[in-house]
Design a protein with these regions (language model features):
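Positively charged, low-complexity, intrinsically disordered RNA-binding extensions
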Residues: 150, 173, 182, 197, ...
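N-terminal beta-loop-helix "entrance" segment that forms/cooperates
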Residues: 34-42, 76-78, 190-193
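Local sequence-structure signature of Cys/Sec-based thiol-disulfide redox active-site neighborhoods
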Residues: 14-59, 138-175
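Structural micro-motif
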Residues: 74-94, 101, 193-205
């Protein structure tokens, strides 16, 4: 994956802001040859892994990328029900066992306008707080376990603004709210199945739809079903 000088400077600047050590797991389709010295992957997996490796390189040891193969690690593939590759997994860091809680499932390209929102999400994952953290924590008692699916594309003007919002909800709620990010161009079959005609398109618990741009407060209203507690800071 060829990263421009400008992108590398952006990555370096953002990775310097990492707070705690974190691990990202990425599922690809690599096959190790007989000498166990070389791995072959599809172009899509190579592109995503190239960016992730650059993040790891510039993280000063705070980010570790763990690569698993749907072909060579079938137990993990089945455990996490991996359907598409590459898939990046953000998981709960509370423990180090083999069943870490899933927070975010990222099946999207990291290039172009999707790079910055991904970097922001990584920072939140490391412990950097979004300004609306208190609102989310205050309202967790009013939110049932939820799943958010966000459909995006590289040419979408508003997607970079909503990606960090939904991801921060998953991270701050420690998985009470699970998020999946799907690129409609990379996965047109999934977009067609859900009848996605424009992006960003957000689906909450497989029934509530948000079209276009929204704020953290808008998402809270939908997750709490209108019962939002306004006592939190920045309400």
């Amino acid at each position: 994956m060829l990263i421009t000088n400008t992108e590398e400077k952006i990555i370096k600047k953002e990775m310097e802001k990492l707070k705690n050590r974190i691990v990202l797991t990425v599922f690809t389709d690599f096959i190790t040859n007989k000498s166990e010295k070389e791995r072959r992957r599809t172009i899509e997996s190579e592109r995503v892994l190239g960016i992730l490796n650059k993040l790891e390189e510039l993280s000063q040891g705070k980010l570790n990328i763990k690569e698993l193969s749907i072909k060579e690690n079938q137990d993990k593939t089945e455990m996490y029900n991996i359907r598409n590759i590459p898939t990046i997994m953000f998981q709960s860091s509370e423990n180090n066992n083999n069943n870490n809680k899933e927070l975010i499932r990222y099946t999207a390209n990291l290039e172009g306008n999707q790079l910055i929102p991904f970097l922001k999400s990584v920072l939140y994952y490391s412990g950097v707080n979004p300004f609306y953290k208190d609102q989310i924590i205050t309202n967790l008692k009013n939110i049932k376990r939820s799943e958010i699916t966000l459909f995006i594309s590289q040419t979408c003007a508003y997607c970079p603004q909503v990606i960090p919002i939904v991801n921060s909800f998953a991270i701050i709620s420690n998985g009470k709210i699970k998020v999946e990010i799907i690129d409609v161009n990379a996965h047109p079959d999934i977009a067609m199945k859900h009848k996605i005609s424009g992006v960003p398109h957000t689906i909450i618990n497989k029934k509530k739809h948000l079209y276009g741009l929204f704020s953290p407060q808008d998402l809270l209203d939908n997750l709490t079903m209108g019962k939002r507690d306004f006592s939190g800071m920045y309400s």
